[in-house]
Amino acid sequence: MPSRRLILAALGALPAQAWAQAQPPKETLTPESFLRGIYTPYPNQDFKGQPFWQVDRFFAPDLARAIEADMREAKRRGEVPKLDGDPFVDAQDWDIAKLAISVKADGSKAVGLVSFENQGKPTEITLDLVRTGMGWRITDIKAPSGTLSELYKK
């Protein structure tokens, strides 16, 4: 028959074990693998784009809040949001080829350069990244049409 001490020790361990299992996994992605996760599907003809409206998956908190606020306000007014194309390819339509990704990281910040041809036109996108508690996230995107930070200052 188990002793009282053994039963109490086992019961005491249960909450700690349950707590440990409930914690999100530690982010192990590098800034380059984060960007590859975003961009690798784009050359696939059937790919419809990343769900950038799921802002917490991609953007740092300040930019995520600005995008969400704009989407809510646009919906309330029955209008198109400021971000009316795919920010990762700077377009509403795409046919991506010759995708290349490079990253320069410095501690908790990184800059990614993504180049590709979209419908035969060479395009370069620069993404500023920061390491957050959720992993690497985008603080700004600089594209031929402008930057997200400028878009949301208007």
Regions found by a protein language model. Name each.
Residues 9-14:
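Bacterial N-terminal signal peptides
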Residues 17-51:
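Short, low-complexity N-terminal intrinsically disordered segments enriched in polar/charged residues
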Residues 24, 29, 39-40, 56, ...:
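Non-catalytic interaction/Regulatory regions outside core domains
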Residues 37, 41-45, 58-62, 66, ...:
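Structured segments of extracytoplasmic/periplasmic soluble domains
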Residues 60, 64-121:
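Surface-exposed, charged secondary-structure patches
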Residues 105-109, 113, 119-124, 132, ...:
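Low-complexity, intrinsically disordered terminal/linker segments enriched in charged
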